[in-house]
């Protein structure tokens, strides 16, 4: 660990995707978020709980909570809809496990996937730009493992929502209930509702506007939502402009789905070239 906090700190479970061929791929908001930050030129750190974190690139600082297992998911598609089956759940994560130095990180991203982070973490970083992807607070494991997940309502107090600088959710996260997203936006100053290839509804001070998706030839959409959220949070830190940040993030996510795996993540230069209408892959 260095003598300075990471520029970007992401908190949540590092996960394993159990693939049909028997192989395992790393995933989770912490994985894709931290990779995005490093590709865009930031130092990154993650606070996670897992049985191990050898899959995390060495450029990313890791504070790991020991766990008997790593949160693991098997994915399948039924009538075009992704289905997830949970095979293992790692230990919970709390503010007490956070190094004191890391509490001064300027950009913090809370990314629960299985309710592993307490909402009280929202108040642990009063000086940071705080982003939240609340996917893991909107679902629970439905029974003994292996088991599917069931949606649950997330009703944070208005004062917690006011502390969040950027809230990013997908239409799937809220089961298509856009009224609840509008309710969040009454208290949270910047809310992004992602719609995949249909773009983003961006609420700023409660007022919605449409941000189009950046055109892409999609090969692998795994992690695209997490990549969007991290890129938008980082660009919001740089510019303070939600619209500009959302367009930048949409382009970053579009480039990421045009390849497979973490290697497809673009650099800052690649994103800017694509935004100018050039080939961001060069």
PLM ranges: what are they?
Residues 4-10, 15-24, 38-131, 274-282:
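Conserved N-terminal subdomain of the carbohydrate kinase-like
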Residues 15-18, 137-138, 216-217:
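A short, flexible beta-alpha/helix-coil linker loop
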Residues 35, 73-76, 199-203:
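Short beta-strand scaffold segments in enzyme catalytic cores
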